Amino acid sequence: MNPPSGPRTQEPSCVATPASPSRWDGYRSSTSSLDQPLPISPTAARAQAAAWIPFPTVDVPDHAHYTLGTVILLVGLTGILGNLMVIYTFCRSRGLRTPANMFIINLAVSDFFMSFTQAPVFFASSLHKRWLFGEAGCEFYAFCGALFGITSMITLMAIALDRYLVITHPLATIGVVSKRRAALVLLGVWLYALAWSLPPFFGWSAYVPEGLLTSCSWDYMSFTPSVRAYTMLLFCFVFFLPLLVIVYCYIFIFRAIRETGQALQTFRACEGGGRSPRQRQRLQREWKMAKIELLVILLFVLSWAPYSIVALMAFAGYAHVLTPYMNSVPAVIAKASAIHNPIIYAITHPKYRMAIAQHLPCLGVLLGVSGQHTGPYASYRSTHRSTLSSQASDLSWISGRRRQASLGSESEVGWMDTEAAAVWGAAQQVSGRFPCSQGLEDREAKAPVRPQGREAETPGQAMTMAMAPWDTPANCELPLHPGWAFH
């Protein structure tokens, strides 16, 4: 007669013990089944579960875990190194430390932390084919993914609004956009993202494992009123609303660029009756720079679109048709949004490429950028050349603005003239070198000008000091929009 056997222990690859029934019940259907052990005490049961696997597993081939783990590792390394390079280059280069570029730096910071907090954990869990870091680790992992993902989306909306205001309302932004105001906007961005990332900690939805159960996210699979309400509000206020704002801004941005392109086509130079090669190059450059940010935004939205579709399918009641692969693959694609920013700037941003060649010469060689003409002196000249070109272009724009202001109230006219004089005073210093602008300047000189106070003199003097004789273009130029200088 065989002696009675003791309590059976479970192999690690077969155990699936949810940590909290209220949170993990929705995932039990996709986990492996357990053999029924002999009765043991509750204390021993808890110790046995903690000693093995405290989270459920899913029955899929090993190569599925390894493939996703390899992809997320490559994405994470690219995101960490690439965004660190963006942060370092923008902070070290004096010509790139502008209020507008603070938004780009913030985007790189959020993308860096997205890669730093998500990729290593996802990779380690994929190698072990199960979640390794317990319930608290799952909640923190999902919280970081939500916080940094929302921050990136709202930062892209702020970038679009900044471009919209500078390009379509250039005079209204003179002296308004500063580093302090940009910092306040970014503080609001982080607080907004934090406000939408904290509710799952307080019972409104939850942070739970997803897909192959090697990563975590908010609970979009449950069909409870609380979870569905959080999912819908989250998509409305952190995805669809920012996306609508971005679309609105870029519609008007490209309208302004198109109108200027049409003006270039009808413009004739002083001698010869055609456009100079430099005019065509400037127009092409402004088009390219306006498209850089749009490309970043489009890739970000496309990266998150599959994940959004999956979550909305679950919201609509079709969670039962979603497989673990359909949950995990879109999550990996969404996390890959963190690598687009540094890649696009390394390929298309001219000042960023020059700064890389200056501060990171080895990478400059790989990018095909020579550091020979990227020293501080060259950067100084390039910055002031852009400033001078921008001020000279204000000649035509201020004329139209003054005529519009004359139709408004007295207070509006005074404010517009004060702002315009700041740029007008600087532009007059070089007007003699722009023959095409001379006629416009003469006409403006004949018009009555409202007396200006000290407020208008100080910005004009500051802009005049920023100019240098070698920065003045010698050929005739068509003024372009003053807000189109990419910072």
From Swiss-Prot:
Classification via InterPro entries: GPCR_opsins, GPCR_Rhodpsn, GPCR_Rhodpsn_7TM, Opsin, Retinal_BS
Give residue spans on the Extracellular membrane side: 1-67, 124-139, 205-233, 313-327
- Compartment(s) of residence: Cell membrane; Cell projection, Axon; Cell projection, Dendrite; Perikaryon
Q: In which tissues is it expressed?
A: Eye. Expression is restricted within the ganglion cell layer.
- Keyword annotations for this protein? Biological rhythms, Cell membrane, Cell projection, Chromophore, Disulfide bond, G-protein coupled receptor, Membrane, Photoreceptor protein, Receptor, Retinal protein, Sensory transduction, Transducer, Transmembrane, Transmembrane helix
SMART domains the UniProt entry points to: 7TM_GPCR_Srsx
Extract the ranges annotated as region (Disordered).
1-37, 436-459
GO CC annotation, single: axon
Q: Which residues lie on this side of the membrane: Cytoplasmic?
A: 89-102, 161-183, 255-291, 349-487
Q: What does this protein do?
A: Photoreceptor that binds cis-retinaldehydes. Contributes to pupillar reflex, photoentrainment and other non-image forming responses to light. May be involved in the optokinetic visual tracking response. May be involved in the regulation of retinal hyaloid vessel growth and regression.
Give the family, as the similarity comment puts it: Belongs to the G-protein coupled receptor 1 family. Opsin subfamily.
> Which PANTHER family does the protein's record reference?
OPSIN
Q: State what protein this is by name.
A: Melanopsin
Q: What is the protein's species of origin?
A: Felis catus
Its ancestry begins with: Eukaryota, Metazoa, Chordata, Craniata, Vertebrata
Report which gene this protein is encoded by. Answer: OPN4
